[in-house]
Amino acid sequence: MPKTISVRVTTMDAELEFAIQPNTTGKQLFDQVVKTIGLREVWFFGLQYQDTKAFSTWLKLNKKVTAQDVRKESPLLFKFRAKFYPEDVSEELIQDITQRLFFLQVKEGILNDDIYCPPETAVLLASYAVQSKYGDFNKEVHKSGYLAGDKLLPQRVLEQHKLNKDQWEERIQVWHEEHRGMLREDAVLEYLKIAQDLEMYGVNYFSIKNKKGSELWLGVDALGLNIYEQNDRLTPKIGFPWSEIRNISFNDKKFVIKPIDKKAPDFVFYAPRLRINKRILALCMGNHELYMRRRKPDTIEVQQMKAQAREEKHQKQMERALLENEKKKRELAEKEKEKIEREKEELMEKLKQIEEQTKKAQQELEEQTRRALELEQERKRAQSEAEKLAKERQEAEEAKEALLQASRDQKKTQEQLASEMAELTARISQLEMARKKKESEAVEWQQKAQMVQEDLEKTRAELKTAMSTPHVAEPAENEHDEQDENGAEASAELRADAMAKDRSEEERTTEAEKNERVQKHLKALTSELANARDESKKTANDMIHAENMRLGRDKYKTLRQIRQGNTKQRIDEFESM
């Protein structure tokens, strides 16, 4: 039995190990990979490897793996990557896994600056990436620094703004919070809908020369071929939709494109190496085939996939709605519980206050009772003294009378009687004054006792009211394959039919233009970042983008502009560049 060969395939989010036979073809390995990851939209993808000359190459599906220019190492290393891009992600990408693989690959391209992305769009895209990873923002879970381990912005953007990590996190967090209620899968799709409007999205660039020898860029994408000046890969100058091309071929470094318009000359350019022309041919064939397929009714398989995807999405939405409903119920229950706890605490506090007031009133009552007793004792003492003085006065009166009688009876001498009379009169006067003073004091004490008695009655009434307040009970708790071409030339007929006249892509608008929410977010971010921007660190692409914005250009307006005029006019324009 022949010895097996170890193979390692790296997808955007996983690493797969396989053992293949020496006679295993590229298609057999590819089929094994897509089956393992559960991918059905296989037409976008391919297996990439570094050949013996360190060039990045796509594995040919119709040849044995071992017969290709793969480095002889163990295990053999391949990357599973998107080779072709859709025109419109929301219309064409059906499965969640397809959307996720595109999302991860596009995000990597943006973060590595392979796809130019302006700062404000980069921050908005970062917030969707965060929503797809973490779900809804939760301040209890997503504490300060929760994005510290994530690479979310291109290094260029970080260097162009005077903001530290915390300040960047704050800005991304604000937009993360804006996406509350959005499913992770929907966040992925929203990311791609904005990213596909970036000028460099989905474009394969090749360095070419025209007949004059001018160095230019050829851009191959889902919509056709575009020509760029050497110093500007954002703004194509001439465009040829796939519907205008009937044949593509190369002979060594010369590449020839024959237009459908028989009156138009051939579109000829030169690549620096034969292998580049082979790759251009393969990409043209694959993109053209997908372009034509999109303009025909969906196959039964695609219809079934779309129906299944709709059903799965509906199921997820139902589950999400159920979860949201349960979450709301739980939150309401928590709030009700908190409210009851709060009311309970308030009532307990009130009860405590009443108890303290009652205790204080009791103490005051006791104090007033004590004072009342003291005043009563004082009153009795004053009364007793007044009675004693009255008695003494009476006795003095009696003595006086007796003396008077004795003077009459005994005829004492006038001087003696006068002296005794004077003494007694003085004594009576003193006793009378003392009596009046004591009576005055008794009246004063009587008034004080009366006031204390009134305070006592009032306190008793307050205590009675406090004690009669009902006891508060504690509330109860609620709860294509690259054509295998060994030779230096190859040709491919690009079939066309009535559907080829469908150039609906020229009517498209950007997500920002048709989505008011995205437009508002981008304007707010542009304004917010302007104050922190270091103008001295602007790149050439930044300046080109700014100029395009000033002139009101976007990807689709430029597309319409560069396709104006007939094919001959555009080929002549290419030759004169």
Curated annotation (Swiss-Prot):
Question: Which post-translational modifications are recorded for this protein?
Answer: Phosphorylation on Thr-558 by STK10 negatively regulates lymphocyte migration and polarization. Phosphorylation on Thr-558 is crucial for the formation of microvilli-like structures. Phosphorylation by ROCK2 suppresses the head-to-tail association of the N-terminal and C-terminal halves resulting in an opened conformation which is capable of actin and membrane-binding.
SMART domains associated with the record:
B41, FERM_C
Modified sites of kind N6-acetyllysine: 79, 139, 165
Q: Which positions fall inside the FERM domain?
A: 2-295
Compartment list: Cell membrane; Cytoplasm, Cytoskeleton; Apical cell membrane; Cell projection, Microvillus membrane
An annotated GO cellular component: microvillus membrane
CDD domains on file: FERM_B-lobe, FERM_C_ERM, FERM_F1_ERM
Phosphoserine-modified residues are where?
74, 407, 527
Membrane-topology annotation of the record = Peripheral membrane protein
Q: Which domain of life is it from?
A: Eukaryota
The chain residues annotated with the modification S-nitrosocysteine are 117
Q: Where is this region: Disordered?
A: 322-342, 358-419, 468-518
Bias-annotated ranges (Basic and acidic residues): 358-401, 492-518
Stated role: Ezrin-radixin-moesin (ERM) family protein that connects the actin cytoskeleton to the plasma membrane and thereby regulates the structure and function of specific domains of the cell cortex. Tethers actin filaments by oscillating between a resting and an activated state providing transient interactions between moesin and the actin cytoskeleton. Once phosphorylated on its C-terminal threonine, moesin is activated leading to interaction with F-actin and cytoskeletal rearrangement.
Tell me how this protein assembles.
In resting T-cells, part of a PAG1-NHERF1-MSN complex which is disrupted upon TCR activation. Interacts with NHERF1. Interacts with PPP1R16B. Interacts with SELPLG and SYK; these interactions mediate the activation of SYK by SELPLG. Interacts with PDPN (via cytoplasmic domain); this interaction activates RHOA and promotes epithelial-mesenchymal transition. Interacts with SPN/CD43 cytoplasmic tail. Interacts with CD44. Interacts with ICAM2. Interacts with ICAM3 (via C-terminus). Interacts with PDZD8. Interacts with F-actin. Interacts with CD46. Interacts with PTPN6.
What is this protein called in UniProt? Moesin
Species this chain originates from:
Mus musculus
Q: What is the lineage of its organism?
A: Eukaryota, Metazoa, Chordata, Craniata, Vertebrata
Q: Which gene encodes it?
A: Msn
